[in-house]
Regions:
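Conserved cytosolic headpiece of P-type ATPases
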Residues: 1-726, 733-734, 747, 762, ...
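Membrane-water interface at loop-to-transmembrane-helix junctions
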Residues: 728-747, 773-781
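Long hydrophobic segments that form regular secondary structure
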Residues: 757-758, 763-764, 774
């Protein structure tokens, strides 16, 4: 049986039951039901049981299970109940279940975000061009391809206008393949030589074309090669990696302390019986449990997941978690002008030259389509098609009179495109592009129906008209023509774009987005440098830059040609002088980004075209455009703007700062709590009594502390979030005095807890004495006081330096978490069955009052230290 590449386009269309105008919506729906979505099969997701077992392999839970095993042996030998063992195992199981639930939620959130950035393609349905998700493609669909598009499925080419496709993912060959429509001979033509086919997994890098889908999903060549698409593990952020390293360091440190305490206790006991060894080992296990912040990883993951979801609701879709942290460090934002700083709603407001000829040239040398409700396509091209329609020149009518039969597609290097059309008298070429580039290739101009030589005087006059439009912040394009008796054999740009006849200029306005000016001001207040990059004329760029507040003077703008005259060393010295770059090409963007990065600045870069991919990859944060962006740029971007709006980047930066601040608050809270537990167990052991058992510490770590820590992750941004400079990306977890804060707060809670233990013991015996061994009343008081102390301390953590009583907003979730944790603590103490299981004694109102008074001390003491720190910071300035 002949392959698709051995048959003509018409034969392939007939076999697929399709036609050049595509399928109807009804046919497509019927085929979708039959063939299924155009997707590659994913690896099977692990079952709930597999996920649960994976959770149980966590080192922290293994330590807890070891503690349960030791406790079981101790209780069996001493004849005590296994209540403590049961409680530890319940905590382990609960933690594993919560881990599975959270993992499932995070996976669902990521899948939802992936849906938001799902690949789309242009397809003909019912004879009209529509944009659909690539997964909805079926055999027989006719797709339209242009530079920057990812080929959505395997297809036979119907048209190719200088189209080149990069097929490295399939063939390993990085050089793009020039595509053609003609048939191929031979039964087994190698995939890389099938020039009339296009394949899923490849990318259009130049030109445009049209293809009929022959194989979707797993029937594609990519599907045959891949078989099953392996799922990649979710990458960890730098913060998560630092926390993992911190966990390993803490584990080693605690192991050393445990060994010391184990030996110390045995030496003090003076006997080496099994019972003594086991009880001493349990003290060491208590210390290990106290030191491990069991809820920390979960809290960080949850806060990141919630933050990423919130950002997506604000039109910033995070594709890589690392971007969340990097956003908070951003120092420079390099942004395209069109569509990002402006509304991307182009309208022709001025023109020069013969109107009818200019409108015809602009409409035909154009890939936008005219539909009932206006033009569809790239906004600039759509504006030109609408301009022609307003003159009574509808594009479909023009195309029927002058059908396209050749072209040199747009290229950002040439800054123009050309198309060739058949006429009654031969062939005509229309060229449109940047005025200076088009004019440079012209030798004549048309006026009043005559073709006249292009003198220097006329050339100067045209450039003056261009400058006058550019000074009004208009985007200006020029049109030219060239006549042929016969269709040119060679249709390369260098062959077509010479000896042109100048027609005229069209000036378009793209209004500035109303919210961008305020966003630029917010950037400056936050210590972020906004930089505008555009292909427009320098005068246009300067006018818009001034209006937005990006620059104050034309000397702060530079052109791409001027950049070409600078070495990298010279650019490094000059890069801080410029905030507006005009007439730039994609390679200039890479140089600009790299110059800023060599300065040590964390840089974000936006882009939409296929040629922007290198600069987006070079930046610390690559930002793709969700509306106008190509699949290539979206795939390499760290973040995609679903509204193509500069203000969204600023919002994302603010959210990134807030998320990082909140994670630090949660870390400080949890580590200060763990510090107090470690110090408490350690010093209590040295003093000769048991402060708390492992099960008590587990309850505090997993129940009492986790809910407030999660609530801190939802804290609103502080008033100075966007008025302080970006943080240094090299800063560690404990930067900004966090390490000192954790230490002194841990010591404070330790002193309060041990004091409470001693008071509880003295109230039990009726006189003052230092406790020895185990005091049930002392342990109960220590548990109650430490729990309340850490609950109150979570309120302190709403701000690292500011007084919590000065914050303008309220964290209702934190209030709920504090009340909930307090209620659960009370439940453990007051419900007899649970209290007995934990080894607690009944608590009197007096003891409640003492514990409450002691725990409350954490608020004024921390507030006082914050006040001293604020005054010290002011003096330092």
């Amino acid at each position: 049986m002949e392959k698709e590449y051995n048959r003509s386009p018409q034969e392939v269309l007939e076999e697929l039951g399709s036609c050049p105008t595509g399928l109807t919506a009804a046919e497509a729906a019927e085929r979708l039901a039959k063939h299924g979505p155009n997707k590659l099969k994913e690896a099977e997701k692990p079952s709930l049981l597999q996920r649960f077992l994976t959770q149980l392999k966590d080192p922290m839970l293994l330590i807890l299970m070891a503690a349960a095993a030791v406790s079981a042996v101790t209780n069996a030998l001493s004849g005590e109940s296994f209540t403590e063992v049961f409680i530890i195992l319940v905590v382990v199981l609960l933690n594993a279940v919560l881990g599975v639930v959270q993992e499932s939620k995070a996976e669902a959130a990521i899948e939802a975000l992936q849906t938001m950035t799902a690949a789309k393609c242009k397809v003909l349905r019912d004879g009209h061009q529509v944009v659909i998700e690539s997964s909805q493609l079926v055999p027989g669909d006719v797709v339209l391809l242009e530079a920057g598009d990812a080929v959505p499925a395997d297809g036979r080419l119907l048209e190719s206008a200088s189209m080149k496709i990069e097929e490295a993912a399939l063939t390993g060959e990085s050089v793009p393949v020039t595509k053609a429509v003609g048939l191929l001979t031979g039964d087994n033509v190698p995939l890389g030589d099938r020039k009339n086919m296009c394949y899923m997994g490849s990318t259009v890098v130049y030109g445009r074309g049209k293809a009929v889908i022959t194989a979707p999903g797993m029937d594609t060549e990519m599907g045959k090669i891949a078989g099953v698409l392996a799922q990649t593990e979710q990458e960890q952020t730098p913060l998560q990696r630092k926390l993992n390293e911190l966990g390993k360091t803490m584990s080693k440190l605690v192991l050393g302390i445990c060994v010391f305490i184990f030996i110390f206790d045995l030496v003090v006991a003076g006997e080496f019986t099994l019972d003594t060894v086991l009880s001493t080992f349990m003290v060491a296990v208590s210390l290990a449990v106290a030191a491990i912040p069991e809820g920390l990883a979960t809290v960080v993951t949850v806060v990141l997941s919630i933050g990423v979801t919130n950002m997506s609701k604000q039109h910033a879709v995070i594709r890589r978690l690392t971007a969340v942290e990097t956003l908070g460090c951003t120092q420079v934002i390099c942004s395209d002008k069109t569509g990002t700083l402006t509304q991307n709603k182009m309208t022709v407001v001025e023109h020069t030259g013969p109107t009818e000829l200019l409108a015809t040239a602009m409409a035909l040398c154009n890939d936008a389509a005219l539909e009932e409700n206006g033009a569809i396509g790239e906004p600039t091209e759509a504006a030109l098609v609408n301009f022609a329609a307003a003159q009574g020149l509808k594009k479909p009518v023009l195309e029927s009179r002058q059908p396209r039969c050749g072209e040199a597609p747009f290229d950002s290097g040439r800054k123009m495109m050309s198309t060739i059309h058949r006429t009654d008298n031969g062939f005509i070429q229309y060229t449109k592009g940047a005025p200076d580039e088009v004019l440079r290739r012209c030798t004549s101009y048309t006026e009043s129906g005559q073709i006249l030589p292009l003198t220097e005087e006329k050339r100067t006059a045209i450039l003056a008209e261009n400058k006058a439009m550019a000074d009004k912040a208009l985007r200006v394009l020029a049109a030219a023509e060239r006549l042929y008796d016969a269709l040119p054999d060679r249709q390369e740009p260098e062959d077509l774009e010479q000896d042109l006849c100048f027609i005229g200029l069209a000036g378009m306005i793209d209004p500035i987005r109303p919210e961008v000016k305020a966003a630029v001001a917010e950037c400056r207040a936050a210590g972020i440098r906004p930089v505008m990059i555009t292909g427009d004329h320098k005068d246009t760029a300067v006018a818009i830059g001034k209006e937005l507040g990006i620059i104050t003077d034309a000397s702060q703008a530079v052109t791409g040609s001027a950049l070409d005259g600078l070495t990298d060393e010279e650019l490094d010295k000059a890069v801080e002088k410029y905030s507006v770059y005009a007439r730039v090409q994609p390679e200039h963007k890479v140089r600009i980004v790299n110059a800023w990065r060599r300065k040590g600045a964390i840089t974000a870069m936006t882009g939409d075209g296929v040629n922007d991919a290198p600069s987006i990859k070079s930046a610390d944060i690559g930002v793709g455009m969700g509306i106008t962006g190509t699949d290539v740029t979206k795939n390499v971007a760290d973040m995609v703007l679903s509204d193509d709006n500069f203000a969204t980047i600023v919002t994302a930066v603010e959210e990134g700062r807030r998320i990082y601040d909140n994670i630090r608050k949660a870390i400080q809270f949890l580590l200060a709590s763990n510090m107090s537990e470690v110090l408490g167990v350690f010093f209590a052991t040295l003093l000769g009594f048991t402060l708390l058992n492992p099960v008590h510490l587990l309850f505090i770590n997993l129940i009492t502390d986790c809910f407030p820590a999660l609530a801190l992750g939802l804290e609103k941004g502080e008033p100075d979030t966007m008025t302080r400079p970006p943080r240094d990306s090299k800063d560690g977890i404990f930067a900004g005095g966090l390490g000192f804060d954790i230490l002194y707060q841990g010591v404070l809670i330790t002193i309060i807890t041990i004091t409470s233990y001693i008071i509880g013991h003295c109230m039990e015996v009726g006189y003052f004495e230092m406790p020895k061994g185990v005091s049930d009343d002392g342990m109960t008081m220590a548990f109650l006081t430490m729990s309340m102390c850490e609950i109150f301390h979570s309120f302190n953590m709403r701000s690292q330096r500011k007084s919590v009583f000065s914050l303008p907003s309220h964290n209702k979730v934190l209030w709920g978490a504090m009340i909930g944790s307090l209620a659960l603590t009370t439940l453990v103490l007051e419900v007899p069955v649970i209290a007995n299981a934990f080894g607690f004694t009944p608590v009197s109102w007096t003891e409640y009052g003492v514990a409450l008074a002691l725990a409350f001390l954490v608020l004024p003491v921390v507030e006082l230290v914050k006040l001293i720190q604020r005054r010290a910071a002011r003096r330092a300035k």
